Amino acid sequence: MQVSQHILMIGAVWPEPNSSAAGSRTMQLIEQFKHQNWHITFACAAADSPFSIDFQELGIEKITIELNNSSFDEFIKQLQPTIVVIDRFMIEEQFGWRVAEHCPNALRILDTIDLHCLRLARQNAFKENRPFSNEDILTSEVAKREIASIYRCDCSLMISSYEMNLLQDVFKIDKALLHYTPFLLNPIQENDTTNWPSFEERAHFVTIGNFLHEPNWNSVLYLKESIWPLIRKELPHAELHIYGAYPSPKVNQLHQPKTGFLIKGRAENAQAVMLNARICLAPLRFGAGMKGKLIDAMTQGTPSITTTIGAEAMHGDLKWGGYITDDPVEFAQKAIHLYKDKTDWLDSVNRGVQIINQIFEKQSHAKLLINRIFDLTNNLKAHRAKNFIGSMITHHTIASTKYMSRWIEEKNKKQ
């Protein structure tokens, strides 16, 4: 008989499933923990958001915590969770050492969401107009912090097989410290597809993504400057509907009804928006992790045109549900072709269904995750004994971070 667990999830932000792929990912993990009847406490230091989930409705205890404050130490000592899931390495830096010191027997899991060091290194290479290489991450300050965080944790959840391989091949991280858990999605059934709007019932192009996320903002500029004018020239009545949370004035300035380039702002329901579009455009020139917009497109029967980075680790050996190209002219040509060619459009829809059902099949990935958690909790001492580097980094982190944090706390008291 398996022991019931008490999970503490420490979030970077309060989860907003309709605002970002990261928010959806957090909800997928919560769903699996709830299926096990585990008690969940969700803690976060961020300001409340009106768009976050209803914790009370889900039966989850919601706690606001503070950075650099010893009140967290008392909180976790009283809570005594058996498992702590930390959202992203920056939050692990803030709270991981406190968990290790005051709740040493709790299993520490890092949900990386994406490899930040990879995304930022690609972003820097793009801005410097040069190809990305592994040297960029090996010399990155963010990589040193992120890899240290992975070592300090008992297990890091990887959403991308590409990033999982990168950690093992480039950083030589033991596979025992990693676990591949992509998006956990329900399979698309035949009765789902029969309810989708047809080719003729759909209209226009769509792109979607949190505007605070630099790869998304860059892709909108790329569409505006290099891709959309080519599409609009061939399809003068087509529109591009651009959805995203947190649009700033600079985003809204791009709104241009005359050319069909429409900034729509936050989507109340991203799936509904995607369901009524004929094509999803995602010309991402840098980034990492899984692209929520492309997942939403495939789950709603919407073909997509994207880049190599956009489709990275998302389709295995399967053919993409649309087209992949890094050339802006070809990108526009493929978008125009797919918008007009019903046969190719239907083939692309079917390939998207195949990807969702084979790569992101919830039941098998969820079972592997829960089994891995049980295996780690049952053998935690032996598991940690094999991770000497992790214990060494944790030792020095507690020694240094502890006093810096206490200094900040005292300084804050005096202000």
Predicted regions located by residue number:
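N-terminal subdomain of nucleotide-sugar transferases
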Residues: 1-51
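Acceptor-binding helix/loop patch of EC 2.4 sugar-transfer enzymes
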Residues: 16, 105-106, 110-140, 200, ...
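Acidic donor-binding loop of glycosyltransferase active sites
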Residues: 81-82, 275-289, 302
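A short, active-site helix/loop in glycosyltransferases that binds the activated sugar's phosphate group
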Residues: 94-95, 143-176, 251
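Conserved catalytic-core segment of nucleotide-activated headgroup transferases in glycan assembly
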Residues: 169, 173, 178-275
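Short hydrophobic beta-strand element within catalytic cores of glycosyltransferases
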Residues: 293-296, 303-307
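Conserved acidic donor-binding segment of nucleotide-sugar-dependent glycosyltransferases
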Residues: 321-329, 337-342
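C-terminal amphipathic helix plus adjacent low-complexity
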Residues: 351-415
